[in-house]
């Protein structure tokens, strides 16, 4: 891989969609669908430049080994289960991550993704997300304050520089469940945040 996928480096995207799926057919259908999807994303980027659209197609360990013929991604491995089910491992074959400033554009791109991948995949989960007021998550706190800022700094930590994987990245996806009732009872004093947006 020589070109960084458009969804790796953007900052401050307001909305996102994550689609996770398993492979139904052979990997060649997945390979062709990925190419079609990348072309579709470029079309949407040209049509909606204000959306700051980006997308990522990522593969699980087993599918990557089939796609690559066993080359590269030496550190890619299945996620182990931790904490007696507190950190379950869903381990799907494919992740499509779509992000931009406009949810309706994301939705259109997701529809294009599902059309491109078609019968090659079995969708297991589709999640729509957004950043709340002032880029806060639903806990009421600003999210991502410790993330590297600026494209060059982000590139330094997120993109592989050399070798067969140059331009590629590893993706680690987590989903957190917040107890909003409990969080809303907590004081924000001393948290580094002056107030909540509500």
Protein language model regions, located:
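Long, histidine/aromatic-enriched segments associated with O2/redox biology
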Residues: 1-198
């Amino acid at each position: 891989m020589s070109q960084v996928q458009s969804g790796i480096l953007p900052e401050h995207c307001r909305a996102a969609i994550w689609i996770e799926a398993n492979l139904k057919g052979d990997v060649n259908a997945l390979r062709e669908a990925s190419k079609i999807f990348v072309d579709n994303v470029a079309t949407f980027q040209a049509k909606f430049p204000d959306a700051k659209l980006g997308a990522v197609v990522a593969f699980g360990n087993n599918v990557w080994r089939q796609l690559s013929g066993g080359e590269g991604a030496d550190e890619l491995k299945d996620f182990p289960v931790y904490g007696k089910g507190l950190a379950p491992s869903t381990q799907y074959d494919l992740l499509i991550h779509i992000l931009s400033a406009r949810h309706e554009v994301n939705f259109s791109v997701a529809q294009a993704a599902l059309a491109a991948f078609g019968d090659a995949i079995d969708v297991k989960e589709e999640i729509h997300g957004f950043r709340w007021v002032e880029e806060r998550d639903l806990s009421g706190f600003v999210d991502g304050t410790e993330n590297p800022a600026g494209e060059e700094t982000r590139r330094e930590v997120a993109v592989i520089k050399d070798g067969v994987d140059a331009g590629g990245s590893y993706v680690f996806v987590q989903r957190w469940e917040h107890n909003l009732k409990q969080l809303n009872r907590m004081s924000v004093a001393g948290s580094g945040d002056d107030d909540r947006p509500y």
